[in-house]
């Protein structure tokens, strides 16, 4: 089942993840729809979870521009994304991008229900880095 992302007017920047015991904080940027890059982002998140205990690392993947395709219901990586979310990784979808797609196509795209809508993907990255997250662009 897919979820339609709310409009920009109703969304806010997502609050920081609640990971009180996290010793490491990483934000992964995904801004293109290259399947190899999608796989690399998923691999980096998986490797971080294996290297650190999932309770010891906060991981947030921020998608914007063509990178939001990772969170579409028909993406081949859907089960991997859902598995990572079950382990505490958060996947954000940029609503500026969603609104642009809707203006261009006349249809609002759907995303996996585990996607967290944020108003501005780059703004979310800035908020996270200002709060101790390390930005990684695989």
Put a short name on every predicted segment:
Residues 8-138:
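Secreted/extracellular ectodomain signature
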Residues 1-3:
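N-terminal export leaders
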